[in-house]
Protein backbone atom coordinates (compact mmCIF):
# COMPACT_ATOMS: atom_id res chain seq x y z
CA UNK A 1 0.00 0.00 0.00
CA UNK A 2 1.29 3.45 -0.87
CA UNK A 3 1.57 6.07 1.86
CA UNK A 4 1.13 9.79 1.25
CA UNK A 5 4.93 10.11 1.05
CA UNK A 6 5.35 7.63 -1.77
CA UNK A 7 2.09 8.16 -3.62
CA UNK A 8 2.56 7.57 -7.33
CA UNK A 9 2.16 10.66 -9.50
CA UNK A 10 -0.02 9.06 -12.14
CA UNK A 11 -0.69 12.08 -14.33
CA UNK A 12 2.95 12.82 -15.23
CA UNK A 13 3.47 9.10 -15.80
CA UNK A 14 0.46 8.99 -18.12
CA UNK A 15 1.68 12.05 -20.01
CA UNK A 16 5.07 10.44 -20.59
CA UNK A 17 3.52 7.13 -21.65
CA UNK A 18 1.13 8.90 -24.01
CA UNK A 19 3.96 10.74 -25.74
CA UNK A 20 5.95 7.52 -26.10
CA UNK A 21 2.94 5.72 -27.59
CA UNK A 22 2.54 8.49 -30.16
CA UNK A 23 6.23 9.12 -30.81
CA UNK A 24 6.04 7.99 -34.45
CA UNK A 25 3.76 10.95 -35.20
CA UNK A 26 5.28 13.31 -32.62
CA UNK A 27 6.24 15.83 -35.30
CA UNK A 28 2.55 16.56 -35.87
CA UNK A 29 1.53 16.73 -32.22
CA UNK A 30 1.84 19.23 -29.40
CA UNK A 31 1.37 18.06 -25.82
CA UNK A 32 0.30 20.51 -23.09
CA UNK A 33 0.13 18.80 -19.69
CA UNK A 34 -2.31 20.37 -17.21
CA UNK A 35 -3.45 22.87 -19.81
CA UNK A 36 -5.44 25.72 -18.24
CA UNK A 37 -8.87 26.06 -19.82
CA UNK A 38 -9.20 29.77 -19.14
CA UNK A 39 -7.00 32.77 -18.40
CA UNK A 40 -9.51 33.90 -15.82
CA UNK A 41 -11.67 31.94 -13.36
CA UNK A 42 -14.53 30.20 -15.11
CA UNK A 43 -17.91 31.38 -13.92
CA UNK A 44 -21.53 30.91 -14.89
CA UNK A 45 -23.38 34.17 -15.62
CA UNK A 46 -26.42 33.06 -13.62
CA UNK A 47 -27.20 29.78 -11.90
CA UNK A 48 -30.88 29.33 -11.03
CA UNK A 49 -31.66 26.54 -8.58
CA UNK A 50 -35.22 25.30 -8.54
CA UNK A 51 -36.90 23.17 -5.92
CA UNK A 52 -37.06 19.56 -7.07
CA UNK A 53 -40.21 18.60 -9.00
CA UNK A 54 -41.50 22.20 -9.05
CA UNK A 55 -42.75 23.28 -12.48
CA UNK A 56 -42.15 26.96 -13.22
CA UNK A 57 -45.13 28.63 -14.87
CA UNK A 58 -43.43 31.79 -16.13
CA UNK A 59 -42.76 31.48 -19.87
CA UNK A 60 -38.99 31.92 -19.67
CA UNK A 61 -38.76 29.31 -16.91
CA UNK A 62 -41.02 26.53 -18.16
CA UNK A 63 -37.99 24.63 -19.41
CA UNK A 64 -36.33 24.82 -15.99
CA UNK A 65 -35.44 21.76 -13.99
CA UNK A 66 -33.48 21.74 -10.74
CA UNK A 67 -30.21 23.32 -11.91
CA UNK A 68 -30.38 25.92 -14.64
CA UNK A 69 -27.33 27.52 -16.24
CA UNK A 70 -27.87 30.88 -17.94
CA UNK A 71 -25.53 32.67 -20.35
CA UNK A 72 -26.32 36.36 -20.96
CA UNK A 73 -25.03 38.55 -23.77
CA UNK A 74 -25.25 42.34 -23.54
CA UNK A 75 -26.94 44.41 -26.28
CA UNK A 76 -23.63 45.06 -28.03
CA UNK A 77 -22.48 41.44 -27.91
CA UNK A 78 -23.45 38.51 -30.11
CA UNK A 79 -23.86 34.82 -29.37
CA UNK A 80 -21.57 32.52 -31.34
CA UNK A 81 -20.75 28.83 -31.57
CA UNK A 82 -17.87 29.10 -29.09
CA UNK A 83 -20.24 30.66 -26.54
CA UNK A 84 -22.50 27.66 -26.99
CA UNK A 85 -19.77 25.12 -26.31
CA UNK A 86 -18.32 27.18 -23.45
CA UNK A 87 -21.67 27.31 -21.67
CA UNK A 88 -22.37 23.66 -22.45
CA UNK A 89 -18.99 22.85 -20.95
CA UNK A 90 -19.82 24.89 -17.84
CA UNK A 91 -22.99 22.86 -17.40
CA UNK A 92 -21.02 19.63 -17.59
CA UNK A 93 -18.38 20.96 -15.19
CA UNK A 94 -21.05 22.09 -12.74
CA UNK A 95 -22.60 18.63 -12.86
CA UNK A 96 -19.23 16.95 -12.22
CA UNK A 97 -17.82 19.31 -9.57
CA UNK A 98 -19.93 18.00 -6.69
CA UNK A 99 -19.17 16.08 -3.53
CA UNK A 100 -20.64 12.74 -4.53
CA UNK A 101 -20.85 10.86 -7.80
CA UNK A 102 -23.96 11.91 -9.76
CA UNK A 103 -25.09 14.20 -6.95
CA UNK A 104 -26.47 16.44 -9.69
CA UNK A 105 -28.24 14.20 -12.23
CA UNK A 106 -27.78 15.26 -15.85
CA UNK A 107 -31.55 15.01 -16.18
CA UNK A 108 -31.87 17.97 -13.78
CA UNK A 109 -29.78 20.38 -15.89
CA UNK A 110 -30.93 23.00 -18.39
CA UNK A 111 -29.11 25.68 -20.37
CA UNK A 112 -30.54 29.08 -21.32
CA UNK A 113 -28.93 31.56 -23.69
CA UNK A 114 -30.18 35.14 -23.43
CA UNK A 115 -29.17 37.66 -26.09
CA UNK A 116 -30.40 40.52 -28.26
CA UNK A 117 -29.51 39.26 -31.74
CA UNK A 118 -30.77 36.06 -33.35
CA UNK A 119 -27.62 33.89 -33.70
CA UNK A 120 -28.08 32.65 -37.27
CA UNK A 121 -24.54 31.34 -37.77
CA UNK A 122 -24.47 29.55 -34.42
CA UNK A 123 -27.76 27.80 -35.13
CA UNK A 124 -26.62 26.82 -38.62
CA UNK A 125 -23.51 25.21 -37.15
CA UNK A 126 -25.53 23.34 -34.54
CA UNK A 127 -27.91 22.10 -37.20
CA UNK A 128 -25.02 20.92 -39.38
CA UNK A 129 -22.69 19.56 -36.66
CA UNK A 130 -25.15 18.22 -34.09
CA UNK A 131 -28.32 17.79 -36.18
CA UNK A 132 -30.14 20.09 -33.78
CA UNK A 133 -33.29 21.96 -34.75
CA UNK A 134 -34.94 25.03 -33.30
CA UNK A 135 -38.57 25.41 -32.29
CA UNK A 136 -40.23 28.79 -31.72
CA UNK A 137 -42.27 28.38 -28.54
CA UNK A 138 -43.59 31.94 -28.35
CA UNK A 139 -42.38 35.47 -28.99
CA UNK A 140 -38.65 35.56 -28.30
CA UNK A 141 -38.43 32.05 -26.82
CA UNK A 142 -36.93 29.16 -28.77
CA UNK A 143 -36.11 25.58 -27.78
CA UNK A 144 -33.08 23.85 -29.27
CA UNK A 145 -34.14 20.29 -29.98
CA UNK A 146 -31.81 17.31 -30.23
CA UNK A 147 -29.63 17.30 -27.12
CA UNK A 148 -29.97 15.35 -23.88
CA UNK A 149 -29.81 18.63 -21.93
CA UNK A 150 -32.84 20.91 -22.51
CA UNK A 151 -31.64 24.16 -24.09
CA UNK A 152 -33.53 27.37 -24.75
CA UNK A 153 -32.69 30.60 -26.53
CA UNK A 154 -34.24 33.91 -25.46
CA UNK A 155 -34.08 36.91 -27.81
CA UNK A 156 -34.86 39.89 -25.59
CA UNK A 157 -36.20 42.38 -28.20
CA UNK A 158 -38.67 39.76 -29.46
CA UNK A 159 -40.15 39.00 -26.04
CA UNK A 160 -43.72 40.04 -25.29
CA UNK A 161 -43.87 43.49 -23.71
CA UNK A 162 -46.83 42.33 -21.65
CA UNK A 163 -45.44 39.02 -20.40
CA UNK A 164 -41.78 40.00 -20.11
CA UNK A 165 -41.79 43.71 -19.34
CA UNK A 166 -38.55 43.78 -17.37
CA UNK A 167 -36.42 41.81 -19.78
CA UNK A 168 -37.96 43.56 -22.78
CA UNK A 169 -36.92 46.91 -21.33
CA UNK A 170 -33.41 45.76 -20.49
CA UNK A 171 -31.91 47.41 -23.51
CA UNK A 172 -29.80 50.40 -24.46
CA UNK A 173 -32.26 52.03 -26.86
CA UNK A 174 -34.91 53.16 -24.38
CA UNK A 175 -36.31 56.44 -25.61
CA UNK A 176 -35.73 59.35 -23.29
CA UNK A 177 -38.76 60.72 -21.55
CA UNK A 178 -41.82 58.48 -21.67
CA UNK A 179 -40.26 55.03 -21.84
CA UNK A 180 -37.62 55.71 -19.21
CA UNK A 181 -40.14 57.38 -16.89
CA UNK A 182 -42.54 54.46 -17.25
CA UNK A 183 -39.74 51.98 -16.57
CA UNK A 184 -38.77 53.83 -13.39
CA UNK A 185 -42.40 54.05 -12.25
CA UNK A 186 -42.87 50.31 -12.70
CA UNK A 187 -39.75 49.64 -10.64
CA UNK A 188 -41.11 51.87 -7.91
CA UNK A 189 -44.46 50.07 -7.84
CA UNK A 190 -42.72 46.78 -7.20
CA UNK A 191 -40.50 48.37 -4.54
CA UNK A 192 -37.48 46.85 -6.21
CA UNK A 193 -35.66 50.16 -6.11
CA UNK A 194 -36.46 53.60 -4.74
CA UNK A 195 -35.85 56.53 -7.04
CA UNK A 196 -36.47 60.15 -6.16
CA UNK A 197 -36.43 63.14 -8.45
CA UNK A 198 -33.41 65.40 -7.97
CA UNK A 199 -34.17 68.58 -6.03
CA UNK A 200 -34.48 71.52 -8.35
CA UNK A 201 -33.42 75.02 -7.23
Predicted regions and their residues:
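Elongated, amphipathic alpha-helical interaction scaffolds
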Residues: 1-196, 200
Amino acid sequence: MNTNDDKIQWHPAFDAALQIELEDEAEYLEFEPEHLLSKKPMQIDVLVKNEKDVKIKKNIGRIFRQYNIIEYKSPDDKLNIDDFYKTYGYACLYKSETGDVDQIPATELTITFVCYHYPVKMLQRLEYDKKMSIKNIENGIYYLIGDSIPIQLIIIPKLSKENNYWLNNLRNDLKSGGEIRNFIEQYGKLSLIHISEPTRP
